[in-house]
Amino acid sequence: MVAMEKKTKLVEEEDGCYYYDYGGYGDGVVDDEGRATELRPMALSRPHTQAFHLAWMSLFACFFAAFAAPPILPAMRPALVLAPSDASAAAVASLSATLVGRLAMGPACDLLGPRRASGVASLVCALALALAAVFASSPAGFVALRFVAGLSLANFVANQHWMSRIFAPSAVGLANAVAAGWANVGSAAAQVVMPVAYDAVVLRLGVPVTVAWRVTYLLPCAMLVTTGLAVLAFPYDLPGGGGGRCPGGGGGRRRSFWAVVRGGVGDYRAWLLGLTYGHCYGVELIMENVAADFFRRRFRLPMEAAGAAAACFGAMNAVARPAGGVASDEVARRFGMRGRLWALWAVQSAGAALCVLVGRMGAAEAPSLAATVAVMVACAAFVQAASGLTFGIVPFVCKRSLGVVSGMTASGGAVGAIVTNRLFFSGSRYTVEEAISCTGITSLLCTLPVALIHFRRQGGMFCGPSATIDGDGDVDDDDDYMLLK
């Protein structure tokens, strides 16, 4: 038993999962299950805050690694003899790896805990990424490099699972959105930092250009190792009390793997949220893969300037996704779950319309760089806010299979990006500008099924609740969470 702070103790349950026993600590700050009722990023002595910062920094490193290749693609092309189609194939490989990794990460979090799953995944991906960077010598090696980097984004599921477990429902939307939003800035950081790091390796260290990109890749590898070790060194998984059981545990016993999986896969709301997320976060993945090349080709910008312009999209995550989480929690205070659902539909529809406009502006005969960037930033704000709004709903779907539901929803982002890439960005049927507009139209249509999501005790967009708060003892998983507890 290790003392951490006043009236706070670290306890190990029989099955080896760690949680905090708060005793009388923090009245009004934590609920009766030990979950934080508000997000205080500057309260660094609080274990909830420490976990929050570790979670987003670990995922930041994963996003940096996953999007490290596109900004230095011009330098990698001659070294690996890449054809134009190879970049698209590698992007699909990265997204496919993200899909596979996130599907696997959900049950892993439910059975092992998000902290262990996240730390191990970061270290494994760091090793695999370093090996891929060293041995890649052909287009196939480049595809393998992007695939390995894409696997690291499985940590998004662990990030959201961890936040959903240690923050109470009144703050979970904000906590999920801020942790994911700040982490997503890693993709923007890669757009800016990787070209600068590459130039430093070539100009200051005198490394040959054919080797310089491999040396540059040591940076994301080092970030993954550092954050992975930090997460594993952190001493606890969950807060104490009733919610402090090991993930996937109902009551005091651990559920079987298949029981956990069935709980999430059998809930239609998880599938609909995955579809919706596939066309908000999926749009973000597409834009972050094509934006730098779009600006280089359409506006004839140098590598560094194109990377900076493309970084504007990812940088909006610092404020837009948290804003979505804040909006989700605020509308829930006034309108309950119906408010969360309406807000998601409205914001994502606006982002889809702006995506259509980005493509139309880029297709103009004399496009304005400033105007195109401005509309792209507005599109990013709404699309990323929609992602925050989506994960303001996820924790209420199925508490006992939270990791599976998170994994299914997060995987929907990768599936949406893969399908969109195959439909609109592969081959020569559409120009990049036309493909971006088609992406927006598809997103607009795929947002409509939000209207079908219904919670038995909270209702949906058009239908009221089908059970009263007092109930009759027939409790389903969404009853485990009250919207404002």
Swiss-Prot record:
Expressed in the base of the lateral root primordia, root-shoot junction zone, leaves, ends of the husk and vascular tissue of the anthers. Involved in nitrate transport. One of its GO terms (biological process) is nitrate assimilation. It comes from the Eukaryota. GO terms for molecular function: nitrate transmembrane transporter activity. The chain crosses the membrane at residues 56-76, 80-100, 119-139, 147-167, 177-197, 215-235, 270-290, 305-327, 341-361, 377-397, 405-425, 435-455. It comes from Oryza sativa subsp. japonica (Rice). The gene is NRT2.4. This is Probable high-affinity nitrate transporter 2.4. InterPro entries: MFS, MFS_trans_sf, NO3_transporter. It is a multi-pass membrane protein. It holds the Pfam family MFS_1. SUPFAM superfamilies: MFS general substrate transporter. Keywords: Cell membrane, Membrane, Nitrate assimilation, Transmembrane, Transmembrane helix. One of its GO terms (cellular component) is plasma membrane. Belongs to the major facilitator superfamily. Nitrate/nitrite porter (TC 2.A.1.8) family. It is found in: Cell membrane. Induction: Circadian-regulation with a peak in the middle of the morning. Induced by nitrate and sucrose in roots. Down-regulated by glutamine, gluatamate, asparagine and aspartate in roots.
